[in-house]
């Protein structure tokens, strides 16, 4: 196996550091230590900016820890590997995975979920599996984020949290498969496994919601409703294949009542991509009695709870949720990269903004503007 000239050495590089919540990120010189057993060091080339990053930075995330290097939607090149790593090699183009896949824990072996349990405890603490960090800045230990930390020129991840992809794949596009697009597309094609002719409603038309629409089209759904309070999202929804667009602010009746009327009793599938618990209830209650299912994708704020009348469930509606669209990162993500290369999966259309790492705070501002779907960072 070839070796990088920096293998086994501490690398000094640039990273965007979140020193404290609700404060701008700071571009710093950081030290990235060599990978240990079953670890991989990656030269990050591109990273998307996700609402989950903003949520943690806001201080509203009860599991948010500081100081930390955020970012979890990145692609790059393997710089070096630690002992006992066999899944990737130096020079491989890769995507970092915030949802790992060890293939040996009870979750992975069950075949029922993509939620690997192998490193969940340490990942939630912002640490590598051995309980330590690979980042330092000015003598301060920096924490990892979601097992990825892609807002850095170099990062270290567990070998079960990275997957090699085809060398022809442009990293400034496929980096977005590290979270949002995969989450929405997988929710439609894997978690729901929509059948031809099924009726679908998607609440919230950011990148995740638009990806749900793309997945529904892939599965040959019938009527596809895009729902958003931003009227500018209508053109986006229709361009990805929605058949209808509804702005709840334009209605005199609750959105669920309108959808039930429009679909002769309710929808086969609804998807919440907002993280708003009131919208989650509307999405469930818009489902058809007897078989309609609502998939919760959006993450609600701390302390929020969902509620509905039990009769909604007794009469056959189902509430479900998914992370990363139900996609198994190491087993299935390379297939999505191939779909993109074969022009069967759209990625580039989502990219409305591109910025260098030094403009990361502006990228966070972009994200909250109604005309931004996805920003891709070039690193450094």
Curated annotation (Swiss-Prot):
Annotated positions binding Zn(2+) 1: 50, 72-73, 179
Catalyzed reactions per annotation: a primary alcohol + NAD(+) = an aldehyde + NADH + H(+); a secondary alcohol + NAD(+) = a ketone + NADH + H(+); S-(hydroxymethyl)glutathione + NADP(+) = S-formylglutathione + NADPH + H(+); S-(hydroxymethyl)glutathione + NAD(+) = S-formylglutathione + NADH + H(+)
UniProt KW keywords: Metal-binding, NAD, Oxidoreductase, Zinc
Cofactors (names): Zn(2+)
Binding annotation for Zn(2+) 2: 102, 105, 108, 116
GO biological process: amino acid catabolic process to alcohol via Ehrlich pathway; formaldehyde catabolic process
PROSITE patterns xrefs: ADH_ZINC
GO cellular component: cytosol; mitochondrion; nucleus
Enzyme kind, highest EC tier: oxidoreductase
EC number(s) from the headed UniProt entry: 1.1.1.284, 1.1.1.1, 1.1.1.-
Cofactor, free-text remark: Binds 2 Zn(2+) ions per subunit.
Physiological role: Oxidizes long-chain alcohols and, in the presence of glutathione, is able to oxidize formaldehyde. Also acts as a S-nitroso-glutathione reductase by catalyzing the NADH-dependent reduction of S-nitrosoglutathione, thereby regulating protein S-nitrosylation.
Name of the protein in its database record: Putative S-(hydroxymethyl)glutathione dehydrogenase 2
Source species of the chain: Schizosaccharomyces pombe (strain 972 / ATCC 24843)
């Amino acid at each position: 196996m070839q070796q990088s000239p920096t293998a086994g050495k501490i690398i000094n590089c640039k990273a965007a550091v979140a020193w404290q919540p609700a404060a701008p990120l700071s571009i710093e010189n950081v030290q990235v230590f060599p990978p240990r057993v079953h670890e991989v060091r990656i030269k990050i080339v591109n990273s998307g900016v996700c609402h989950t990053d903003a949520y943690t930075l806001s201080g509203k995330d009860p599991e948010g820890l500081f100081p930390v290097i955020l970012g979890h939607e990145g692609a790059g090149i393997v710089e070096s590997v630690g002992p006992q790593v066999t899944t990737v090699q130096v020079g491989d183009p890769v995507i970092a995975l915030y949802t790992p896949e060890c293939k040996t824990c009870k979750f992975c072996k069950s075949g029922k979920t993509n939620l690997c349990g192998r490193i969940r405890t340490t990942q939630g603490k912002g640490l590598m599996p051995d309980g330590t960090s690979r980042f330092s800045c000015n003598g301060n230990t920096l924490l990892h984020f979601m097992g990825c930390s892609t807002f850095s020129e170099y990062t270290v991840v567990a070998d079960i949290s990275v997957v090699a992809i085809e060398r022809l794949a442009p990293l400034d596009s496929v980096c977005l498969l590290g979270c949002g697009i995969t989450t929405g597309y997988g929710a439609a094609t894997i978690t729901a496994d929509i059948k031809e002719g099924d009726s679908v409603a998607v609440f919230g038309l950011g990148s995740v919601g638009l990806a749900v629409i793309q997945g529904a089209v892939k599965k040959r759904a019938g009527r596809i409703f895009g729902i958003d309070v931003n009227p500018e999202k209508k053109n986006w929804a229709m361009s990805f294949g929605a058949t209808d667009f509804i702005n709840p602010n334009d209605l005199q009746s609750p959105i669920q009542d309108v959808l039930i009327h429009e679909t002769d009793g309710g929808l086969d599938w609804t998807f919440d991509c907002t993280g708003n618990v009131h919208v989650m209830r509307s999405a469930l209650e818009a489902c058809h009695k007897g078989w309609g299912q609502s998939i919760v994708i959006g993450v609600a704020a701390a302390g929020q709870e969902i509620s509905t009348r039990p009769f909604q469930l007794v009469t056959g509606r189902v509430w479900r949720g998914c992370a990363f669209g139900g996609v198994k990162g190491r087993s299935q993500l390379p297939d999505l990269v191939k779909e993109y290369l074969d022009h069967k999966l759209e990625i580039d259309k989502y990219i409305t903004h591109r910025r260098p790492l030094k403009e990361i705070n502006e990228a966070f501002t972009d994200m909250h503007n109604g005309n931004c779907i996805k920003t891709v960072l070039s690193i450094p």
